[in-house]
Amino acid sequence: MIEIKNVSKYFSGNKVLKDVDLKIKGGEIFGIVGHSGAGKSTLLRCINGLETYDEGNVIVFGKDLKQINGKNLREFRKEVGMIFQNFNLLNRKDVYHNISLPLEVWGVPKNEIASRVKELLELVDLTDKIHSKPSNLSGGQKQRVAIARALALNPKILLCDEATSALDPNTTKSILNLLRTINSKLGITIVIVTHQMEVVKGICERVALIDAGVIKETGDVENLFLNPSSEMKKLIGQSDDDVLPKEGINIRVIFPKNSSEGALITSMARELNVDFSIVWGKLERFRDDVLGSLVINISEENKEVICNYLVSHNAIWEVA
């Protein structure tokens, strides 16, 4: 669906995207995370041609964006919707006419516009706000209008640029649920740029970490958060050094979905008759699953027998 090959971009002589490689599958919800200024929004805008790039290729729907221009670029952008942090609604127009605007630009007949706007308002659960002005809407309602407008032309891809950054946690959750519904019902590919880790955990299937214009790693959300690299730890502000004991050996056991590592730990203590301490643990929700990990502290003399036990039971673990 979307393939980015060795893409680089310069601003005023500075290389803001550096040899970026990414593949985003059709129908998935994909996250791009990083600190402010990391290059994530610039990368997102390269996907729909709002930003040009200097090197490499961005291939969408099998077409290289560098080879698309004029009328063909306009047709291409019809297939890619986008929502923003600040909603970008027209304050002088009511909800109906904000949503209908792209349809009007494309010359869709009025009766078809009315039908499509009604359908979209039902999808985003705002039928009672059809004649309201943006000034009379909450932040969450404004974003729902923006989502409806972005979907007006039946795009195959929806790009979300910090779409929940201006919203409170409860409203953010409702918007994420809406996006998941849209993904499920319409099969639309969603690419989300965010610095909010809870957004990634709540909706994304896979995620790429970008820092200073470089893709540091890409993978399943669960794996990147439950067994984070040093780069991911830096992003989420996690440091084991302040938590884990300096004496003994610390072993982290990962709890993926549909696992029984919790029972494994108690069985290990009983069967091996060894002492250890549980020094750190957490449970987190990823989409519909609750996953977690814990760290046990063991003595040097018990290291071999405990590690052999974990290996023999196919546990997911590492020395922390």
Curated annotation (Swiss-Prot):
Subcellular location: Cell membrane
Gene expressing this chain: metN
Signal peptide bounds: none
Gene Ontology MF annotations: ABC-type D-methionine transporter activity; ATP binding; ATP hydrolysis activity
ABC transporter domain: residues covered: 2-237
GO cellular component, one term: plasma membrane
Reported function: Part of the ABC transporter complex MetNIQ involved in methionine import. Responsible for energy coupling to the transport system.
Catalytic reaction(s) noted: L-methionine(out) + ATP + H2O = L-methionine(in) + ADP + phosphate + H(+); D-methionine(out) + ATP + H2O = D-methionine(in) + ADP + phosphate + H(+)
Alphabetical list of PROSITE patterns matching this protein: ABC_TRANSPORTER_1, ABC_TRANSPORTER_2, METN
EC number: 7.4.2.11
InterPro entries: AAA+_ATPase (IPR003593), ABC_transporter-like_ATP-bd (IPR003439), ABC_transporter-like_CS (IPR017871), ACT-like_dom_sf (IPR045865), MetN_ABC (IPR041701), MetN_ABC_transporter-like (IPR050086), NIL_domain (IPR018449), P-loop_NTPase (IPR027417)
Gene3D superfamilies reported in the protein's UniProt record: 3.30.70.260, P-loop containing nucleotide triphosphate hydrolases
Subunit structure: The complex is composed of two ATP-binding proteins (MetN), two transmembrane proteins (MetI) and a solute-binding protein (MetQ).
Protein name: Methionine import ATP-binding protein MetN
Keyword annotations from UniProtKB, A to Z: Amino-acid transport, ATP-binding, Cell membrane, Membrane, Nucleotide-binding, Translocase, Transport
Main localization of the protein described in the UniProt heading: membrane
Membrane-topology descriptor: Peripheral membrane protein
Organism: Clostridium acetobutylicum (strain ATCC 824 / DSM 792 / JCM 1419 / IAM 19013 / LMG 5710 / NBRC 13948 / NRRL B-527 / VKM B-1787 / 2291 / W)
